[in-house]
Amino acid sequence: MNLRTQIATLALAIGWSLVLAHAEEQVFFAFDDHNIAWQHNLKLTLVPATKHPDNPVLRRGPKGSPDHGHAVLYGTVIKEGSKFRMWYLGMHETEILKGQAPGWWRPMCYAESMDGIHWIKPDLGLVEFNGGKNNNICLIEGELHSMTRVNDFLSILHEPGDPDPSRRYKAAYIAHMPYEDIKGGMSRIGVKEKRVGVTICATSADGLRWKVSGDRPANAGGERFEVSGLYRFGDFYYTTGQLISPWSWRPDGSTAGRVMLAYRSPDFKTWSQAKAFAYARPGQLVEPPVTGQQMHMGAGLWNRGNVMVGLHGMWQDADAKPPKGESWNYGVRVDLGLLISNDGIHYREPVPGFKIIPRGPEGAWDDIAILQGHAFVNEGDQTMIWYSHWDTGSKLKSMEIGLATLRRDGFGYLSRKEDDNDAHFITSTFTASEISLNVDGITADAPLTVQLLNHLDQPMEGYSAQITQDGVHRSIAFSKPLPAGKKIALRVHFPVNSAARLFAIYLNP
């Protein structure tokens, strides 16, 4: 490598590190009781999402297509420029045999949209299927065939600033590999299966043509793992997912149903064998545990810079054993609940049991179980969330993809609890050049008053203002610029007659 190349490579690496270190917009959500811990006379109200009237917005394909059996968003939606991009799991057969997709393969399929509602499945021309390449299957190449066969949840991470163009898209997915294919083997914890669920990582320059990373699964040498998440938070990449006893257990060593665990890597190459206990539903940790309550497949996650927000599967066992001849999980029901994490490792549910996206009423297309994806986009004044339906009876009924929407970042809001008293909160400290609020319900005779505080909660002279109008991004106009580089906090006051609802605070660096 000549000196010019070395300098260019170093510059790219430095630029990449600066991109990673650069603080983007921070969000203090109304349901974040770490960043909005100090409250007086306030209550939190969560808001269920509204399902699109034309659901499902992405349907399975015709006979002979790779998604004729199902099209499920065990996958990812991102927006690049003006285009929405979706990676989802297809299945070409219309029948599940022995509890698995044919050949332990559900192809990584791809779709595009200009509005997030109307989707096309482009002919990528990359993978031979049913006698031709006119399909929307993404290409995955690797040394071992069994490592290229996606069979469950695929998570896509887009990092356009990566200095290596071939790594600007990253993926983690579940493959079911024969033990003899796994270099390094697996741990002796748990029960040995015919095939083992492993974490496969891959990289791509365009999100369509993928190369498997390395010659072994990321969890080689460890336990089976159903990976269902991939993100970068701080200095590490994280994969999150699901595990169950005997491969995992509650913190005291006792038997656990499905719980969420996390692994990490500093470079997307070497992954920890040690893992963190990321989340379990409250009923799973009491003694005795709540019967039938589990969390399903980790969480569909959204990295907002300073916090992770997500939706997790609220699994409830069937009331009775399945009738003879039915699937083992016949009667299982799943809704989607809200999660948040301030460290990218440990997650909590702001209001345990609240359903942000509930399954539909009996007879609706999504009436059995709801599946989450990494599929959140803020578009204008709304938040768009895509999800899919799971037929736990294994008949593949309506296993397609739907859309739900909220007010922009409108998962929940703070408002006064008692009508005849004022209210306020104080945030954690931060640095910012601009502050704005996501708020509604403000009236001319009841504006919100905002006051900057120093790190000792003392008011700062010249930094008081009133919010007199609603808006999803209502800027606070102080009489002078915010103090550069100083740790400050924000006090927001609701007068006695206020009907205001505050959804979020935005802090621009």
What are these regions (language model features)?
Residues M1-R4:
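N-terminal secretory signal peptides that target proteins for export/translocation
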Residues A8-S17:
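Bacterial N-terminal signal peptides
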Residues H22-P509:
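Carbohydrate-active catalytic/glycan-binding domains of CAZyme proteins
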